């Protein structure tokens, strides 16, 4: 994911001889390269979508606080949840129910595509861009006012139909123009990856996560059928809802790779590989660490590949693997070709 960093600088602190932006980006680059994390940042959103291969530049916000410490708050945002975040400019006379309904409809749009259960960050106030910033800061806010706590409680009640899909709701509110009521929603997936530390003359104090996990007994309802990737008959015979353990050779490709495949075929009439009876995993693998065959691989939001389904399945793909629901057009294309979606 893309790294978002909030740096709070104490008024008694003097940062001399350093470029804070360069420091942050150097640290992000070092962390992503040395830990073999997946690098997800492209050079320019419109004109050069080549990977920087360093996961930089990070997004940096600075603020000033009282005291002699430097506080660093960091979050890592994946596109699966960020793509379904939203901002709406309400009329000042809008009710709480209007705001709650906006959040509800945004969650309906996100569906399963953003990896529920979710943590929601709500930002209210300022301008359009500031409300969005507040919705990010909300994830670090543990000092809500009584009014904010009541607002969150009422929102949770309004969203009761989503209770199993929401881990928590966080809120930051601020002043705004007399004629404005901007509200922003940032959706975080169940990982909601974030960290904090405070740097003082005495050293660095990290906020530690609670790592006391509960052991769960094996659930027999999750019994898996073993299927091999080259057993096309077994794959085509799979039924909706079956849990399988898939073994064998598969391909990984996300939207950028799909676009290249389609564009190359349109230009040259050839495919980069024989797609017949192949399986494509909608994922971007991380670099392999020493002694690893392949790095960690995480599924991406399948709906981004929906527009390629007809092409891919009609050219021989037998199954795709990803997360989240598919559009009706994608389902129809998969069914028409006798394919599967895992």
Q: Which sequence ranges carry the predicted segments?
A:
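Conserved phosphate/anionic-ligand binding catalytic regions in large, soluble enzymes, centered on
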Residues: 1-14, 114-131, 173-191, 243-244, ...
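Alpha/propeptide regions of enzymes that mature by internal proteolysis
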Residues: 1-48, 84-86, 90-117, 128-169
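Short, ordered loop/turn segments at secondary-structure junctions
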Residues: 10, 79, 124-127, 172-174, ...
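Domain-length cofactor-binding catalytic modules of enzymes
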Residues: 142-220
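Feature captures the catalytic cores and cofactor-binding loops of soluble hydro-lyases/lyases
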Residues: 143-163, 252-342
């Amino acid at each position: 994911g893309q790294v978002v960093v909030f740096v709070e600088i104490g008024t008694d602190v003097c940062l001399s001889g350093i470029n804070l932006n360069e420091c942050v980006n150097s640290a992000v680059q070092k962390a992503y390269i040395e830990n073999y994390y997946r690098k997800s940042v492209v050079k320019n959103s419109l004109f050069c979508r080549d990977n920087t291969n360093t996961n930089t530049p990070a997004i940096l916000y600075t603020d000033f606080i009282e005291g002699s410490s430097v506080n660093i708050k960091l979050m890592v945002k994946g596109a699966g949840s960020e793509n379904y975040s939203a901002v709406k400019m309400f009329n000042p006379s809008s009710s709480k129910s209007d705001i709650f309904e906006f959040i509800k409809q945004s969650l309906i749009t996100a569906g399963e595509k953003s990896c529920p259960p979710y943590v929601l960050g709500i930002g209210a106030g300022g301008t359009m861009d500031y409300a969005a910033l507040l919705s990010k800061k909300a994830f670090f806010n543990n000092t809500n006012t009584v009014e904010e706590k009541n607002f969150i409680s009422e929102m949770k009640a309004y969203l009761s139909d989503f209770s199993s899909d929401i881990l928590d709701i966080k809120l930051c509110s601020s002043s705004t123009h007399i004629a404005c009521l901007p509200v922003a929603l940032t959706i975080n997936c169940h990982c909601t990856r974030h960290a904090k530390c405070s740097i003082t003359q005495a050293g660095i104090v990290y906020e530690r996560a609670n790592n006391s996990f509960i052991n769960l007994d094996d659930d027999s309802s999750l019994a898996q059928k073993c299927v091999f990737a080259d057993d096309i008959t077994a794959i085509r015979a799979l039924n909706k809802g079956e849990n399988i353990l898939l073994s064998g050779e598969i391909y990984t490709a996300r939207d950028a790779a799909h676009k290249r495949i389609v564009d190359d075929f349109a230009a040259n009439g050839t495919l980069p590989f024989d797609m017949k009876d192949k399986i494509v995993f909608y994922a971007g693998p991380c670099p392999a660490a020493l002694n690893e065959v392949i790095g960690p691989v995480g599924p991406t939001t399948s709906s981004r590949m929906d527009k390629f389904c007809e092409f891919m399945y009609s050219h021989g793909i037998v199954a795709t693997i990803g997360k989240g629901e598919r559009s009706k057009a994608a389902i129809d294309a998969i069914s028409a070709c006798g394919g599967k979606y895992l």
